[in-house]
Amino acid sequence: MEHFISIRDIGKKEILNILEEAEKMEELLNSEKHSNIMNGKILATLFYEPSTRTRLSFETAMKRLGGTVVGFTDIANTSVMKGETLPDTIKVINGYADLIVMRHPSDGAPRLACEYSNIPIINAGDGSNQHPSQTMLDLYTIKREIGHIDNIKIAFIGDLKYGRTVHSLCHALSFFENIEIVFIAPKELKIPKEITDDLDNKNKLYNNNIKYSETGDIDLTGMDVVYMTRIQKERFPDLSEYQKVKGTYKLTREHVEDKDLIIMHPLPRVDEIDISVDELPQAKYFKQSFYGVPVRMAILKILNEKNKNKKSEI
């Protein structure tokens, strides 16, 4: 794994390796021992779009491993505003850092960046396309809170059209056995056909008994996992279309308090989960956010080890 751009670039072996390494990183965090795994290394965080959890958890992960962080969170203060191209920015950063984490509004921008980089690049989200480190912490949450990833029934609710976390997680789940998925969304935000086609293809390839269905109604009977998403206002080309679907779904105590399941959400939350749900034992979205640190520690460690002998050609 030279870069980490899409969950589609890795297989089940690599996924399990990251999960195993994340367990070790969580143990390290709980032990409060100091790590120097990334001592002397610099992580550059290039965030062309806003971020709270992803950026801060990557920065925390790097510092917990003994490394340091440089970067930007607002392109208004960078040479991008002067017309600097992405390839030029990447070439420059290659001379400053050992790894790059980047978020960009354009689908495919991190993959383009890889063509101009001699150091590992991690995709922290590109448009409505991919968010692979979020996928890994989602899988890690399921494994830690349920005990296994195989043999689960999961409901995805909300913005399934623009929700890159949903797209990535569906692909990752396709490597596991006996997964049943229920897509719950308004017709305007239904899961893209390319995602369901991918599930069909994986089912034929691995014969791992993946099932899925689509509906507009919330019925959580028999679910192991509920994965809520916000309606992503910033992705709508027409604001009037957003107004039609905003507030379509709101998860309440009545939906879940008598059910044996876990509730996940990639955050930020707007109004799709009532705050009264927060105190229920089923609510795991803040724990899910915490798991981002050991998972991203694992990703940084693996990429650093894989690329430690690769020297910059600049």
UniProtKB/Swiss-Prot annotation:
Name of the encoding gene: pyrB
Protein's organism: Methanococcus aeolicus (strain ATCC BAA-1280 / DSM 17508 / OCM 812 / Nankai-3)
Residues involved in L-aspartate binding: K82, R164, R230
Biological pathway: Pyrimidine metabolism; UMP biosynthesis via de novo pathway; (S)-dihydroorotate from bicarbonate: step 2/3
NCBIfam families named among the record's database cross-references: asp_carb_tr, PRK00856.1
GO MF terms, alphabetically ordered: amino acid binding; aspartate carbamoyltransferase activity
Assembly information from the UniProt record: Heterooligomer of catalytic and regulatory chains.
The protein's Enzyme Commission number: 2.1.3.2
Cysteine pairings via disulfide bonds: none
Gene Ontology process terms (BP): 'de novo' pyrimidine nucleobase biosynthetic process; 'de novo' UMP biosynthetic process; amino acid metabolic process
Role, per record: Catalyzes the condensation of carbamoyl phosphate and aspartate to form carbamoyl aspartate and inorganic phosphate, the committed step in the de novo pyrimidine nucleotide biosynthesis pathway.
Catalytic activity, reaction form: carbamoyl phosphate + L-aspartate = N-carbamoyl-L-aspartate + phosphate + H(+)
Broad enzyme group: transferase
SUPFAM superfamilies given in the database record: Aspartate/ornithine carbamoyltransferase
HAMAP family hit by this protein: Asp_carb_tr
InterPro entries for the chain: Asp/Orn_carbamoyltranf_P-bd, Asp/Orn_carbamoylTrfase, Asp/Orn_carbamoylTrfase_sf, Asp_carbamoyltransf, Asp_carbamoyltransf_Asp/Orn-bd
Residues that, per the record, bind carbamoyl phosphate: R53, T54, R103, H131, Q134, L267, P268
UniProt keyword annotations, A-Z: Pyrimidine biosynthesis, Transferase
UniProt xrefs under Pfam families: OTCace (PF00185), OTCace_N (PF02729)
Family: Belongs to the aspartate/ornithine carbamoyltransferase superfamily. ATCase family.
Protein name: Aspartate carbamoyltransferase catalytic subunit
UniProt keyword Transferase, yes or no: yes
